[in-house]
Amino acid sequence: MSKVENKTKKLRVFEAFAGIGAQRKALEKVRKDEYEIVGLAEWYVPAIVMYQAIHNNFHTKLEYKSVSREEMIDYLENKTLSWNSKNPVSNGYWKRKKDDELKIIYNAIKLSEKEGNIFDIRDLYKRTLKNIDLLTYSFPCQDLSQQGIQKGMKRGSGTRSGLLWEIERALDSTEKNDLPKYLLMENVGALLHKKNEEELNQWKQKLESLGYQNSIEVLNAADFGSSQARRRVFMISTLNEFVELPKGDKKPKSIKKVLNKIVSEKDILNNLLKYNLTEFKKTKSNINKASLIGYSKFNSEGYVYDPEFTGPTLTASGANSRIKIKDGSNIRKMNSDETFLYIGFDSQDGKRVNEIEFLTENQKIFVCGNSISVEVLEAIIDKIGG
């Protein structure tokens, strides 16, 4: 199929539910300088800090050094921000932060706002979508996924997954001639379950009424050269044109390709050595795994993976946020440095994030588990944008 945009034209992109900017990372790899982030929506502070570290290396050259503590607190208190990705921070929250941490956060939020972060997705309708070529929206999966409580995504439901309809609200507030040419959605496979069928069909029909043609597929990151078997639903919606999503045909990498060659002592799970392992068995997804006998009543919590094969889906929480790997006679965990590589970021990205000392291991793995395979995004962006 012919490519539908000329790469010499800058692709103007808005990242809704931006996370750590997997879309931006893919754009950087595919289009080099031929793209522009014209705005984003993200309210989870650790993700914003990591986004700015990865894409702008902001913490090595703080732009706002001489701002008083009172001014920083006043600024942050007037933004809709979250520290847990679920709820806004409480009154007085920023006053409890130490000066060094507060300064890093303040700089990250200021720079993010400078790049067009609206923070609260519910404000997207107030911002014109004019002069945006590509709007990406990987809306929250918590109310859809098997890991979550499956409240669904009905319009007006008040669920986090129901924030999808803020995209509809923004499109409705935009003149038809000013609509973005491309809309790119990503979410978990449960989006296609019968429980969510009615809402997904409503959404597709809404887009069709605006002139979009939809291509929707389940794509596996392993088919695009990732070390991870990560199946996610993608939909590309194009104004007055059909663009087919790419079919992955690359050989997956093994888990060991993203693992540090020297294993840190803190990553070795000595407490598991007392458990015997079942025989390793290979799945259809090229995952080779065994189980710790008697370790947990939850099967996935006891899985141990062979590093010579493809790995499982990394999740933000639950058993698959704690991936266990056989390492000779030991069992080790996948650490946060490795999860950045596992989702398709570069080694320098994890190093930059590690330079910010207040970010925890759990927060780093959480954002990677919530992110999108950069390898899949590269293939999609190459097809629609070049």
From Swiss-Prot:
Species in which this protein is naturally found: Spiroplasma monobiae (strain ATCC 33825 / MQ-1)
Function: This de novo methylase acts completely and exclusively on CG residues in DNA; methylates unmethylated and hemi-methylated DNA.
Keywords, sorted A to Z: DNA-binding, Methyltransferase, Restriction system, S-adenosyl-L-methionine, Transferase
Organism domain of life: Bacteria
NCBIfam families: dcm
Protein name per Swiss-Prot or TrEMBL: Orphan methyltransferase M.SssI
InterPro entries in the record: C5-MTase (IPR050750), C5_DNA_meth_AS (IPR018117), C5_MeTfrase (IPR001525), SAM-dependent_MTases_sf (IPR029063)
Active site: 141
Protein family per UniProt: Belongs to the class I-like SAM-binding methyltransferase superfamily. C5-methyltransferase family.
Domain SAM-dependent MTase C5-type: 11-386
Recorded coiled-coil stretches: none
EC number of this enzyme: 2.1.1.37
GO BP annotations, alphabetical order: DNA restriction-modification system; methylation
Pfam family, one: DNA_methylase
Enzyme class: transferase
Any one GO molecular function term: DNA (cytosine-5-)-methyltransferase activity
